[in-house]
Design a protein with these regions (language model features):
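Fe-S-dependent hydro-lyases/dehydratases of central metabolism
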Residues: 1-746
């Protein structure tokens, strides 16, 4: 809750909302209404239809997305950020030799990026967490997340802060820039889903398995446009970092956000990390920071849907490969692996990421490997560990946890994202060789971690991952299987029991952190004139008032098309601040429905085939005035990277027409002035052919809620019409006409 809003004012706002709605309020609604722009309480908003305008308390950016966010903020011509903001350098460090060396290499190879980000942070009054200081979401949880607050972040896993009772939403850089410039932030009023947890986790079951259960039920699209609110006595029994694992991976369901209702575990966590003032403030607002009684008594009157989960029946599970919603119980995995023909040997186990790198997570893993060590066993599989932050690293070092993991064979990587986002210089497996890895990450898309499309990545909990590292075999079940120690004795692992945090408290050492500068008038933002890494953004041209006529189709994608496919990371991360260079990866991983190739298409004008999409886009833009992209279901799933919208815009895309969109990507397309349209009839996707030309007509009549008409011209000259839907508001239509949202405000 915003400290600038006193309790009396908050209660008045909420009382007005209760009267307007004729019922009590959920926790999520309270946070939204207490951050509503304008004069709250005058209109009952319809979920999924109406927009709500909000003023977030905080903006967070990681270094790969902060570059474009800051370049856009600079165009807004403000002297300082209007809200608290931080930049976190966690995405550009490549995992190779280990923590100190990898950070040193990153500081050298990314010097101009770090100079730009640190100088712009200083110039505009933002906090700067330098390379090696921690993964953004763990750092936010430890230092900034607060019950009742509202935060936006330029990373899709920003809802991690929901584990500490904060409503946190992943956005694109344009949203962040506008909020930092003092403007409101607008989203469709979300559909509310209540998740009532009962019971307690048992044995090897973990918070990771709870979110896997949710993914099994809802899939990767079931959360779109929704906020999932977790509550109940089962929720109260989870630690803050367990809660954060669940809210973090709510992003995999496409949610707007996920959040836990404030409880005593949050008070304890805040005090343990040294945030006594925040803990005391939350305690004084405890009556506000909870659901109204109706949520427990008659949840159906508040929530669109109510989900019941008994934690006591949750079992340990794995997710994968290639999608986080393919869930297999650990006890069934060997049978499935044999049937599918997956390799039985584990080629690597990776522990960490923003999802599972807390003290409690690493304590559980250490318990497992210590038990193995007592029998003379070390990890059979290569074992890599990324601590969540400098504070976590110093704490596990102090408490002996680090030593246990290193003795078991763990290589300690920097406190950064590393292999989770493809920043992994992997040397043991050649590209194209089938292999299996287990990770505690949150995503397992094809080729995401190591660039190898034949790597089958499975997600699991830290304790199970540690047991698998020791066993080295994919089918090992730590609940029932035994291992023979070097001492000749057979043993079965004991189920780990880890505390919520260190009793001695979290280390206060923050490492490479620079607080906001108080006097920044004389500070200059550093951009090298001939930089190959940072480039000032062009101003996108305004809509010329004409219809889009007979545009070629750049690609019709088939199946899962994530932002990783549209604008890959890995080797391209270094160009995230250079729109010209980053656009050369356009749709590099997308599967062409016409040819079955990835990243290439046919020039329908010249007849040349196998052309990289960025070259094809350039040709179409220069010779036909642009192009359209056709997408399948949930187009743009995955990370919040706005490059997946900005690059198509830069290369000449006029519209993306899909069966459906992922929330953040659709918002990013709108921000960049691209029409985001969906087929009114899903079967029309199947009718689109490679040589078709697409005309989008009567654009001048574009109106909220009114369908758009497209005319499809076949190769033989015949035509047919297709009805398209859009979700543009009046304000967003003005963005389109202005050429981008940024154009509309500058």
């Amino acid at each position: 809750m915003d400290r600038h809003l006193n309790r009396d004012s908050a209660e008045k706002i909420l009382a007005k909302k209760r009267k307007l709605l004729g019922r009590g309020l959920s926790y999520s609604e309270k946070i939204l209404f207490l951050h509503e722009a304008g004069r709250p309480g005058e209109k009952a908003l319809i979920a999924g239809r109406d927009q709500i305008r909000l003023y977030p308390d905080r903006v967070a950016m990681q270094d790969a997305t902060a570059q474009m966010a800051m370049l856009q903020f600079m165009q807004a011509q403000r002297e300082r950020t209007r809200v608290e903001a931080t930049i976190h350098c966690d995405h550009l460090i490549t995992a190779d030799e280990g923590a100190p060396v990898d950070v040193e290499k990153a500081e050298g190879s990314n010097r101009e990026i770090y100079d730009f980000l640190s100088s712009s942070a200083a110039k505009y009054g933002m906090g700067f967490w330098g390379p090696g200081s921690g993964i953004i979401h763990q750092v936010l949880l430890e230092n900034y997340a607060a019950p009742g607050g509202l935060m936006i972040g330029t990373d899709s896993h920003t809802p991690n802060a929901g584990g500490l009772g904060m409503l946190a939403v992943g956005v694109g850089g344009a949203d962040a820039a506008e909020v930092m410039a003092g403007l409101h932030w607008e989203i469709p009023f979300p559909v509310l889903v209540g998740v009532r947890l009962s019971g307690r986790l048992r044995g090897w079951a973990s918070a990771k398995d709870v979110i896997f259960e949710m993914l099994k039920r809802f899939g990767v699209r079931g959360g779109t446009g929704r906020i999932f609110e977790y509550y109940g006595e089962g929720a109260e029994g989870l630690s803050v970092t367990q809660k954060a694992t669940i809210t973090n991976m709510g992003a995999e369901m496409g949610t707007t956000s996920s959040v836990f209702v404030y409880d005593e575990s949050m008070d304890a966590y805040l005090r343990n990390v040294g945030r006594i003032e925040d803990a005391d403030y939350a305690k004084t607002c405890a009556e506000i920071l909870t659901q109204d009684e109706i949520c427990a008594r008659e949840p159906g009157k508040v929530f669109h849907e109510v989900v019941e989960i008994d934690l006591s029946v949750i079992e340990p599970t794995h997710a994968g490969p290639f999608t986080p919603d393919r869930i297999t119980r650990v006890k069934d995995f060997n049978e499935v692996a044999v049937r599918e023909g997956w390799p039985s040997e584990i080629s690597a186990v990776l522990l960490g990421s923003c999802t599972n790198s807390s003290y409690s997570d690493l304590y559980a893993a250490a318990q497992v490997v210590e038990e193995a060590g007592n029998h003379g066993l070390r990890a059979k599989a290569p074992f890599l560990l990324s601590p969540g932050s400098t504070r976590i690293y110093e704490t596990i070092k102090r408490d002996g946890i680090l030593d246990s993991l290193v003795k078991a064979g763990a290589v300690i990587l920097s406190s950064a994202c590393g292999p989770c986002i493809g920043q992994w210089h992997r040397k043991d497996i050649k590209t194209g060789v089938p292999n299996v890895i287990f990770t505690t990450f949150n995503r397992n898309f094809r080729a995401r971690n190591d660039g190898n499309p034949e790597t089958r990545a499975f997600l699991t909990s830290p304790a199970v991952a540690a047991a698998l590292a020791i066993a080295g075999n994919t089918g090992f079940n730590p609940e029932t299987d035994t291992l023979e120690g070097a001492d000749g004795m057979e043993f079965r692992f004991s189920a780990p029991q880890s505390p919520p945090f260190s009793e001695e408290g979290l280390s206060s050492f923050r490492g490479n952190f620079i607080p906001p500068a108080e006097d920044s008038v004389e500070i200059e933002v550093k951009i090298e004139p001939q930089s190959e890494r940072i480039e000032l953004l062009p101003v996108f041209e305004r809509w010329d008032g004409k219809d889009f006529l007979e545009l070629p189709i750049l690609v019709k994608t088939r199946g899962k098309t994530t932002t990783d496919h549209i604008s890959p990371g890995g080797k391209w991360l270094k160009y995230r601040g250079h729109i010209t260079h980053i656009s050369k990866n356009l749709l590099e991983g997308a599967l062409n429905a016409f040819s079955g190739e990835r990243g290439r298409g046919t020039n329908v004008i010249t007849g040349e085939s196998g052309v990289k999409f960025f070259r094809l886009a350039k040709y179409y833009n220069e010779n036909t005035g642009g192009f359209v992209i056709i997408g399948d279901e949930n187009y743009g799933e995955g990370s919040s990277r706005e490059h997946a919208a900005m690059s198509p815009r830069f290369m000449g895309a006029k519209a993306v027409i899909a069966r459906s969109f992922a929330r953040i990507h659709e918002a990013n397309l709108k921000k960049q002035g691209i029409l985001a349209l969906t087929f009114a009839y899903h079967q029309d996707y199947d009718r689109i052919e490679e040589h078709d030309r697409v005309s989008i007509v009567n654009i001048a009549g574009l109106t909220p809620g009114k369908p758009v008409k497209a005319v499809i011209k076949k190769r033989d000259g015949s035509t047919y019409e297709v009805m398209l839907y859009h979700a543009l508001t009046g304000e967003q239509i003005e963005w389109f006409k202005a050429g981008s949202a940024l154009n509309a405000i500058t």
